[in-house]
Amino acid sequence: MNLKIVTMAFLLAISSIALCQSASELNKTDQLGRKQGHWIKKYTNEIVMYDGFFKDDNPVGEFRRYYENKVLKSLLIYSADSKEALASIYHSNGFISSKGKYINQLKEGKWQFFSISINGYLICEESYSKNLRNGMSFKFYPDSTVAERLSFVNDIRQGEWIQYYPNGEVCLKSSFLNDKVNGKFDVWFENGKMELSGQYNNDVRDGLWQIYNTDGTVKYKLEYVGGVSKNRQMDIDESEYLDQLEKNKGKIPDPEKTGVIRP
């Protein structure tokens, strides 16, 4: 009986020593004040803020950050030289928010962005170069069909721009030049019939615009010069319709801010 008590006391002592040694190895800095080894930082309420490893003040290996509700905020896996990191970032509810790669703390290559309200719903996929969008950008509906595609050059919208209905039919087709809508601007009903067609010149309506009925017949013809219609007698409803369409064109929400895409 006494032997059991002595043995238990010995094991407890060993465990306490190990814990003390482990704690003493945390949050170390070298003579130059640089973080080295295993670091755990906590919020004022003692909840862990981050848990990771440093070498010469730079993060290496797995590095985890947490929200104050203890949910994982991000997991970054750093290269040995700390220049590259594979990132998985999470919403505060635990759903995945985005995935991609950093090089020198800048987004690089393909990045994916996910919904805050539907777990795993991929909203957007974009290509980055030195933290700027370059190449094709795709937005998706919850069933993974494409909602929109357009291209970027150094974070500026350039080239063809297409939006789709959930059934795959084209909703809108136009193009950008230096981040402004430029050239033909066509919109279709979900049944595939033309809804309106017109022309933009540097984000301003220009030339002949036609509005169609759902059966494809022409409802109105309007002539624009520098964004001003010559047809001042047209019904106010149709004028407001075009104004609203212009206001909302391309307003699929920023995938980094919301999990909803406008149909």
Regions flagged by a language model, labelled:
Residues 1-26:
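Bacterial Sec-dependent N-terminal signal peptides
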